Amino acid sequence: MGRVLIIGAGGVGTVVAKKVAQNSDVFTEIMLASRTKSKCDKIASEITNVKIQTAAVDADNVPELVALMKSFKPELVINVALPYQDLHIMDACLEAGVNYLDTANYEPLDEAKFEYSWQWAYKQRFEEAGLTAILGCGFDPGVTGVFTAYAAKHHFDEIHYLDIVDCNGGDHHKAFATNFNPEINIREITQKGKYYEDGQWRETEPQEIHKPLTYPNIGVRESYLLYHEELESLVKNYPTIKRARFWMTFGQEYLTHLRVMQNIGITRIDPVLYNGVEIVPIQFLKAILPNPGELGENYTGETSIGCRIRGIKDGKEKTYCVWNNCSHQAAYQETGAQGVSYTTGVPATIGALMFFKGLWRKPGVYNVEEFDPDPFMEQLMTQGLPWHEQFDLDLEL
């Protein structure tokens, strides 16, 4: 049954490999591949109950990817590499006849802009090949889309207002660090904000709109409106939505560091000449910042991510909140990774489970909310990300 190729051996790749191995009744063999094979070997050395192989692969090199896929013959690729590499991996999957799952949408290397159009354009090719591509199956995007689908299926006739709220209430005890790839993280939060309202996308300056929100078990945190990719697919798949926004918490110290780095130009994504060599400042910054995959040991506190929804059921307005809280220490004790990596890697594993069980499998390219949310929601409870819900309360939004 489940031969799976995992591409990427950072914090999320670590979690995916270990969670896949925990589900050995479904997954029978793993190939873990990354540009740096030694990182894969280290992860593989900690997995004993499932057959696991490792390989070095350049995820920008389609022929190399195809050769690996044809050699190992996986049924599914779990892509937890960089968003710049999504299209290369999808191309390789089509050539090798392999199904596909990722956790983040494509972003061009030379432009801080992400959208689904590039990947949605693959729909016909995946249909014709009889292959499934599951997009954005982390937490946000991913679980947030499943939460929305679950709310639409069970609690609303029409969803009108959707706010996705993401709080990291943890402390990694570093002056400055990002919780996932620094280059991707900084590009995401320094670009302009955007939200959907009354059929239009409205743009804001970075961190222009913010307000205090209360997060379960954490308390009040200042939350900033920014653009996040799942908004694009959710307003497409739920056309009754009148407004959709995404909020994320940042501490003042984090924002001050970020502002200084922007002001001195080290977050630039265009090449500069240094000692006769072209370097990209943000890539240099990534090299000297703490590795997100190594933050877990001293990380305390928890994350809280969820959806706050207002809409209509049986002609009456109602509100609904659904969320998960994840302890950094519990995540580290189970997988050796911090909570942000854990909350991305576990849903990717569940998405793969849904595929192998035949529950999320149909030719084409799909976002997670286009599948039945119920079996995924059940697996969240048993795989380490239990969720909670409340009805008819003040959404603060």
Predicted regions and their residues:
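Conserved Rossmann-fold cofactor-binding substructure of NAD(P)-dependent oxidoreductases
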Residues: 59-73, 85
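Hydrophobic/small residue at the entry helix of a nucleotide-binding pocket
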Residues: 12
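Rossmann-fold cofactor-recognition segment
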Residues: 47-61
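C-terminal catalytic/substrate-binding lobe primarily of soluble NAD(P)-dependent oxidoreductases
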Residues: 153-397
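Rossmann-fold NAD(P)-binding glycine/threonine-rich loop
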Residues: 104-131
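Helix N-cap at the beta1-alpha1 junction of Rossmann-like dinucleotide-binding domains, i.e.
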Residues: 36-38
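N-terminal Rossmann-like NAD(P) cofactor-binding module of classical short-chain dehydrogenase/reductase
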Residues: 69, 75-79, 100-101
